[in-house]
């Protein structure tokens, strides 16, 4: 018996998810994320603060973005097959940023 054909998802499927639904798109497959735990959020908040302070104390030009923040690591024309939401992203190259997030890998 043949295996059922696996559906390939696109960035449009990610955009169509209900508000608050967190997921990543990797090679055409959607990976849903469970809500973060309280401990996870505490650690994320601590790291976000420490990284921001480190950058500011050194007069750095980078920006820190905690999740949810959209990262499009690879772009090939209009065919976006990867969409990630890292816990923390540090962006130093402002040309990577637009209203939707970061285009290219975070720094």
Locations of regions flagged by a protein language model:
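Gly/Pro/Ser/Thr-rich low-complexity, intrinsically disordered segments predominantly at protein N-termini
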Residues: 1-107
């Amino acid at each position: 018996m043949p295996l059922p054909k696996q559906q390939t998802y696109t960035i449009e499927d990610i955009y169509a998810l209900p508000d608050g639904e967190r997921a990543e798109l990797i090679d055409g497959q959607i990976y849903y994320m469970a809500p973060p735990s309280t401990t996870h959020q505490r650690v994320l908040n601590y790291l976000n603060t420490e990284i921001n302070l480190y950058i500011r104390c050194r007069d750095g030009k980078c920006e820190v973005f905690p999740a949810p923040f959209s990262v499009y690591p690879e772009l090939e024309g209009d065919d976006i097959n990867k969409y990630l939401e890292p816990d923390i992203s540090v962006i130093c190259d402002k040309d990577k940023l637009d209203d939707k997030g970061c285009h290219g890998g975070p720094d």
